[in-house]
Curated annotation (Swiss-Prot):
Main location: membrane
GO biological process: cell wall organization; peptidoglycan biosynthetic process; regulation of cell shape; response to antibiotic
Top-level EC class as recorded in UniProt: hydrolase
Listed EC numbers: 3.6.1.27
Record's miscellaneous remark: Bacitracin is thought to be involved in the inhibition of peptidoglycan synthesis by sequestering undecaprenyl diphosphate, thereby reducing the pool of lipid carrier available.
Recorded GO MF terms: undecaprenyl-diphosphatase activity
The protein, known as: Undecaprenyl-diphosphatase
Species of the source: Acholeplasma laidlawii (strain PG-8A)
Length: 277
């Protein structure tokens, strides 16, 4: 019975990761909060850190499937631009290589920030709560722009600004998808375009992160303490990420970002309250 309860915990963690990775409410913040509520307040140790990477891989696979056509076009046209002189002249190839470069520009800052400071960031309930409240305030500020016209395409300057803002997502509790929405919408870029750009950034970022996670698993096989549990979390993270991205693209608008703002505020206050008591 105890082991079944443990497996249920893994399933819940996978669902939390799948939903909160896509919605702008911070998956890292929710998973830290969950570990405190259901795992007896344990710190995020090597095993849990690896677990977070595995559930992230579930989200990665879901987004890769959802955006497979876009990813395929970007990869193929990038190779065509480099190796095929005739294809290089085609407008669509030039547009796709330009978009790929913008994605790279946008992920460089968070990559550097992650390497330099990620190991030194606090992951207690107080810091998580504060970060979630910051996420809430940023989403609310963008909500105030709901009556503005959003029509701009993403330029190299836009990508740079989004990248600099996205850098702050290394702080647990700051939603990466949320802060990229803020970065894009504040530059009057249409929300569907920002979402596509944001999640393609996530796919690029996840490749080295997942690679490091697999390396750590091979290097420290003891951290893979519960393969069935990890597998369940991966599966449920994948399923719920795929469901949530479909909901996100179909229903999320600038006007209803207020609900995510209120939700992040509520969870942030709960996190701070739990820290105090």
């Amino acid at each position: 019975m105890d082991y079944i309860i443990e497996l249920i915990k893994y399933i819940i963690l996978g669902i939390i990761q799948g939903v909160t990775e896509i919605f702008p409410v911070s998956s890292s913040g929710h998973l830290v909060l969950f570990s405190n509520l259901f795992l007896g307040g344990e710190d995020i140790n090597a095993t849990l850190t690896l677990f977070l990477m595995i559930t992230n891989m579930g989200s990665f696979l879901a987004l890769l499937i959802y955006y497979f056509k876009d990813v395929k076009e970007l990869v193929v046209d990038s190779f065509n631009f480099v190796f095929n002189k005739e294809k290089r002249k085609e407008i669509i190839v030039q547009e796709n290589i330009s978009y790929a470069v913008k994605l790279i520009i946008a992920i460089v800052p968070i990559g550097i920030a992650g390497l330099l400071i990620k190991d030194y960031l606090p992951t207690n309930l107080l810091s998580i709560g504060i970060s979630l409240i910051i996420t809430s305030l940023l989403l609310f500020l963008v909500f105030l722009l709901r009556n503005k016209k959003f029509s701009n395409d993403i330029t190299f300057k836009n990508a740079g600004v989004i990248g600099l803002i996205q850098m702050f997502a290394v702080f647990p509790g700051i939603s990466r998808s949320g802060i990229t929405l803020v970065g894009g919408l504040s530059q009057k870029i249409e929300i569907k375009k920002v979402m596509r750009f944001s999640f393609l950034c996530y796919l690029l970022i996840s490749i080295p992160v997942s690679g490091l996670g697999l390396y750590d698993a091979i290097k420290n096989p003891g951290t893979m303490s519960d393969i069935p549990g990890f597998s369940l979390a991966f599966i449920f993270s994948f399923i719920f990420s795929l469901l949530t991205i479909k909901i996100m693209h179909k229903y999320v608008t600038v006007k209803n970002l207020i609900w995510f703002s209120l939700y992040a505020l509520t969870v942030g206050l709960v996190s701070i309250t739990l820290y105090i008591i």
